[in-house]
Amino acid sequence: MKIILIIFTLLVSAGCENTVPEFSGKNAFQYLEKQCSFGPRNPGSLGYKECLTFLLQELVATADTVWTQPFTYDDLHRGGSYDLQNIIARFNPNAEKQILLGAHWDTRPWSDKESDIENQNMPIMGANDGASGVAVLLEITHILKSNPAEIGVTIVFFDGEDLGMSGDNTSYALGSQYFAKNLPIPKPDHAIVLDMVGDKHLHLPIERLSYRHAPRLAREIWKLANRLNLPAFDQSLGYSIFDDHVPLWEFAEIPAIDIIDFDYPHKFDNYWHTQEDTPDKCSPASLEQVGTLLTHHIYGIE
């Protein structure tokens, strides 16, 4: 009798494991390259407009509902005005349990961390800082289309995350600020934001503000990564980073965490906000680790 029970338990466990769809890092990397093929996607640029069209086409093909949330930002530091828009896609919007997955789709108009002064006014390509999180979530949308989840998932591509001036946090994360202050959906149970998740040398400690404001969710996600043997995820605490997760809990009281590798590739040699943030610095394997974690989270929620 014990043998039969053990076999039955193993079969049930195997069946549950098979209900989690496989995430393709290869597909996600193609989405990263596609975004970069438009060039820099800083607001107002040709690349921005072409990428917007591409993202809307992808989401309309997979989601139940898709729309944009337009807003305007007046840059008091540098002057000028920007017409920006968050992109919102919902899957199973009538489900009782709802989560939000987000990433910023804009890229920085300046390479202010460039050592070469002549290049500091050039827009960045943003393969990691811009395209990587969006790439993971685009692959997630195709998984949700083919394998409808029991929970509802809202995917938001935030605009204007990277228009900020150093020292003024309020000039960063503009899209998530506007979204949280003008919440266009019922409040989700929690949110997970992705940023800079494509680094070939991916290292993901627990972002410190995430742990401070959503400790239960942070512990749950990193424990899941540990169970899945995803080596990029480090159980130790990392930096405190003002990112798109902060306005979500600050203005909308949504428990939110940020999955981010800020040392790109490491603290002594960083491609962040330079001309070196290009697809060759990223890898399908890194995207796959993050996407695998999210798929197991989505399909494991009861």
Predicted features and spans:
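Extracytoplasmic/secreted proteins, especially bacterial periplasmic and envelope-associated proteins
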Residues: N27-K34, E50, F54-A61, S132-E139, ...
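Sec-dependent signal peptide recognition
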Residues: M1-I7
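C-terminal motif of bacterial Sec signal peptides marking the signal peptidase cleavage site
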Residues: V12-G15
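A non-catalytic alpha/beta surface segment that caps or lines the substrate-entry region
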Residues: E33, P40-N94
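Acidic/histidine-rich catalytic neighborhood of metal-dependent amide-processing enzymes
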Residues: N121-R216, L237-S240, D244-H245
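Active-site-adjacent substrate-binding region
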Residues: T68-P70, D74, S81, D199-E302
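Structural recognition of the beta-strand scaffold that forms the well-ordered cores
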Residues: I88, Q98-G102, T154-F157, D189-D195, ...
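Second-shell loop/turn segments in exported
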Residues: T19-E22, S37-L46, Y73-R78, Q120-G130, ...
